[in-house]
Regions:
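Hydrophobic alpha-helical context, especially transmembrane and signal-peptide helices
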Residues: 1-5, 73
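Conserved S-adenosyl-L-methionine
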Residues: 3-4, 24-34
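The start of beta-strands in P-loop NTPase/AAA+ ATPase cores
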Residues: 5-6, 124
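Conserved beta-strand elements of the Class I
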Residues: 6-7, 101
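Polyanionic, low-complexity intrinsically disordered segments
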Residues: 11-12
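Histidine-anchored nucleotide/phosphate-binding helix
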Residues: 15-27
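Reductase modules of NAD(P)H-dependent flavoproteins
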Residues: 33-139
Length: 139
């Protein structure tokens, strides 16, 4: 487990990878803050909200932020809107000492990486399976 703040950024079904990380960490408690951001197109896609909210209610160091990218699809949605990676970054003034896991499509993962690195996170601070199976083309 990381020894600093952990930021988990999931797009759509990428939540399943983050769920696995959380379930691995939970038995020992969250020694450092864990922030889970889950981005979906519309609020009805938030199929694990109850589980995420239960983690938040059990652990003071766990924070859950659902984000809807297309609020027009969810007229009753009163939560956060926008791109999940941007919303995650906006919550932190200093990202120089965080660990970030990102799960989503290549475009989303690389745009999140670029934004966090631009704000001071070392590139090695971010992890995603995308880096292995869809590496960024060399320029």
């Amino acid at each position: 487990p990381p020894d600093n703040t952990l930021i988990l950024v999931a797009a759509s079904t990428g939540i399943t990878q983050m769920k696995s990380i959380i379930e691995y960490l939970e038995p020992d408690g969250f020694k450092h803050p864990v922030h889970l951001y889950w981005g979906v197109v519309c609020d009805r896609d938030l199929y694990l909200t109850s589980l995420c909210e239960s983690w938040e209610s059990k652990h003071s160091n766990f924070h859950f932020v659902p984000v809807v990218s297309e609020p027009d699809t969810s007229p009753n949605w009163a939560g956060r809107t926008g791109l999940v990676g941007v919303e995650a970054l906006n919550d932190f003034e200093d990202v120089s000492d965080v660990t970030v896991y990102v799960s989503g499509g290549p475009g989303m993962v690389y745009s999140t990486l670029d934004a966090f690195v631009e704000r001071g996170m070392p590139q090695a601070g971010m992890h995603s399976d995308i880096f292995s199976f869809a590496p960024r083309p060399k320029s």
